[in-house]
A protein has these predicted regions:
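Solvent-exposed edge beta-strands and adjacent loop segments
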Residues: 1-29, 192, 197-204
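Extended Gly/Ser/Thr-rich low-complexity repeat segments
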Residues: 45-58, 91-100, 182-193, 294-299, ...
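Acidic, low-complexity/disordered segments
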Residues: 74, 81, 219-257, 284-347
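Amphipathic, non-transmembrane alpha-helical segments in extracytoplasmic/periplasmic proteins
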Residues: 27, 34-36, 83, 97-123, ...
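Short beta-strand-centered interaction patches in the first periplasmic/extracellular domains
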Residues: 60, 69-90, 126-211
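Oligomerization/assembly interface segments of phage tail-like spikes and tubes
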Residues: 26-40, 77-88, 216, 272-286, ...
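Surface-exposed cap/loop segments at beta↔alpha junctions
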Residues: 41-128
Length: 347
């Protein structure tokens, strides 16, 4: 396996072939990341400068070098490189104008990217035509944070796909394929002990941060302030949260449009505070269902763990490709990973 290195202008710089470890983590709702370990050599020092790009042939993603550590001791002479995938360029941009949008989520994601300060070499990819709709207003928000929110709201993934021949980077929105047992259109994919592809399993579920009713406060003061409620529950099942949405202004909107924008903010908050449940496993040398042939990132598959009484249809939200000791290990995560905390500052 060779790792090709490019500069930020997408010019080819060289090849890394002497790595001891590479962890390439693809993520559906956010930029993926990587961690690379290589020996310290003059050539590797040249290639691993901050801002350079790492890419492997056939990949739809490339990683930006953001962190580099040099370590020398009696037992170690190593460079450790870490970075996020190209879509993290959006973390460098703000939505500075007031954007009011009512329409399809995919088109909103594309419009937000077009409305910020230009990211060099980035262009819109082909429009897929996903029908999911949204209504929202955003001002002075981080572009990447909002793209992630929109993607999660409609179960859409996104990426920056590099084309090193054209020296362009394409923003693509995509949706995984339904491969569950309950459907009959696509080839089914099942992860279970009987298929020997559910090894070293970890299952997590957590409701500590769960909220199911949001009270959203819009513009105005005191009794004149506009409020909307999103969600319903009673008794011990009721878990309430307040969302301050004064940044959403009613200018140039009807009353119905304004309340719809507040409701969208409330739904975003509840989506970020859902019950978390996830499977993580080592697929082993699975010959029944092969990665990127029978299934890929974003697909919805059936996961069965009979000993634990669990059978669920879950989306593959993350896939770790681990390259070590001359081999490759695939570790998918199914479902929603458990957040350490919820950041309410941008809701």
């Amino acid at each position: 396996m060779e790792i090709r290195v490019y500069n930020s202008e997408l010019d080819f710089l060289g090849i890394i072939e002497n790595q001891t470890s590479l962890i390439w983590t693809r993520k559906y709702f956010e930029p993926g990341d990587c961690e690379l370990h290589i020996p310290i050599t003059e050539e590797n020092l040249r290639l691993t400068r901050r801002g350079n790009l790492l890419w492997m042939k056939g990949k739809k993603e490339a990683a930006i070098i953001e962190d580099r550590k040099l370590e020398e001791s009696d037992s170690r002479n190593e460079i450790t490189v870490k970075g996020r995938f190209l879509s993290s360029y959006m973390d460098r941009r703000l939505i500075k104008s007031t954007v009011y949008f009512s329409g399809k989520v995919e088109e909103a994601m594309r419009q937000l990217l077009q409305g910020v300060t230009l990211i060099p070499r980035v262009e819109l990819g082909e429009l897929q035509g996903f029908a999911d709709k949204v209504e929202f207003q955003a001002t002075y928000k981080n572009l990447l944070v909002y793209e992630e929110k929109l993607g999660r709201s409609a179960n859409l993934g996104f990426r920056f796909r590099p084309d090193f021949n054209e020296k362009k980077i394409y923003f693509e929105v995509y949706r995984g394929t339904d491969r569950t047992m309950s459907q009959g259109v696509n080839n089914r994919v099942i992860f279970s002990e009987s298929y020997n592809n559910l090894n070293d399993t970890i299952y997590r579920e957590n409701a500590q941060l769960y909220k199911n009713v949001a009270y959203v406060g819009g513009e105005g003061e005191g009794s004149a302030r506009v409020y909307v409620q999103v969600g319903e529950a009673t008794g011990l099942e009721l878990r309430e949260v307040f969302v301050d949405a004064k940044d959403i202004q009613s200018e140039n909107m009807t009353s119905a449009q304004y309340k719809a924008a507040l409701e969208t903010r409330g739904r975003e908050t509840l989506e970020g505070a859902a019950v978390s449940a996830s499977f993580e496993c080592d697929t082993g040398a699975d010959e029944n269902f092969r990665y990127q042939i029978n299934y890929d990132l974003g697909d919805v598959v059936t996961v069965k763990k009979r000993a634990w009484g669990i059978t669920e249809d879950l989306r593959i939200t993350e896939i770790q490709e681990i390259y070590e000791y001359g081999g490759r290990k695939i570790v998918p995560t199914f479902g929603t990973a458990i957040p350490e905390k919820i950041d309410w500052s941008d809701t």
